[in-house]
């Protein structure tokens, strides 16, 4: 970013760019992505935001590539990147990596799900889950390290860390009740209270309630 005529503008290699970005339809196949990227390239749009899903199979999206702890179907991810670059050799790709977990993880850690006030579980872990954060952070590190050492790195402009419902970090289940009342969320809230107030007395004074601890 640099100032240009009194406004912050995007430059790349010294050249002014609009920063306009396209995103293929979420359930598109590799061919569908190719066609969309090609058409936008013809209109002068080189930035491409593409979603890489560890969890949700939706149409022919690029998903189900997180196979086990530390194991990934990198050829599936690379095939999607390859189609983008074939459609536009000048593509500047924003890799949107979803911080979701696959079914094998959900089966292994059912206690990490969010829970509504009515007792309904979310379909993905609570954002307060330390187990989710540690495992997804490792996945993100593994994927970015692999891509940065691949031949696709020169076309990757950046990474978008997407989480929660629809990538905007809404809590899972937010539209279906009051979340999050899971034990992991309760534990996280208690830890936050301890850090913020340090003693019961300070908490009681701040909340104007002599009964809270």
Question: Predicted segment positions?
Answer:
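N-terminal carbohydrate-binding accessory modules
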Residues: 1-41
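Short, charge-rich amphipathic segments
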Residues: 2-9, 72-82, 188-190
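Extracellular structured ligand-interaction cores
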Residues: 7, 45, 81, 90-92, ...
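Generic hydrophobic, helix-prone segments enriched in Leu/Val/Ile
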Residues: 11, 36, 40, 52, ...
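Short, solvent-exposed loop/turn segments at secondary-structure junctions
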Residues: 17, 27, 54-55, 99-102, ...
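Hydrophobic faces of well-ordered beta-strands that scaffold small-molecule active sites
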Residues: 18-24, 48-50, 93-97, 157-161
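Aromatic-lined substrate-binding rim segments of carbohydrate-active enzymes
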Residues: 32-121, 127, 134-148
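Polysaccharide-binding and catalytic clefts of secreted carbohydrate-active enzymes
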Residues: 106-213
